[in-house]
Amino acid sequence: MTGKTVTRADLAESVFRKVGLSRTESAELVETVIDEVCNAIVRGETVKLSSFATFQVRDKNERIGRNPKTGEEVPISPRRVMTFKASNVLKTRILKAHVARKVKLKPQNPAS
């Protein structure tokens, strides 16, 4: 893993370089896309971005949990959670990148 975190500013800069919009327009475009995705998720809609992922809101029922320290049973209230499911295309890209990285890092044995 590289440890790098991609930020909104990084996305806007990438749009600026690749699309040719101004930096301001690029930042506004990134914000608009993120806002639209967030608003749809908050409304309970499924957001499917082909070749990337699906974001979905799920309702979880009330259930009984257990305090790990005391062993006491405690009720866990019902709630809504968001799930992220990577597409098969994204999963394949991640796997290929992982395999390529392993091959690149593999120590070479000198020819005898």
Swiss-Prot record:
This protein is one of the two subunits of integration host factor, a specific DNA-binding protein that functions in genetic recombination as well as in transcriptional and translational control. It comes from the Bacteria. Heterodimer of an alpha and a beta chain. GO terms for molecular function: DNA binding; structural constituent of chromatin. It comes from Rhizobium leguminosarum bv. trifolii (strain WSM2304). GO terms for biological process: DNA recombination; positive regulation of metabolic process; regulation of DNA-templated transcription; regulation of translation. Keywords: DNA recombination, DNA-binding, Transcription, Transcription regulation, Translation regulation. PANTHER family: DNA-BINDING PROTEIN HU, INTEGRATION HOST FACTOR SUBUNIT ALPHA. Belongs to the bacterial histone-like protein family. This is Integration host factor subunit alpha. HAMAP family: IHF_alpha. GO terms for cellular component: cytosol.
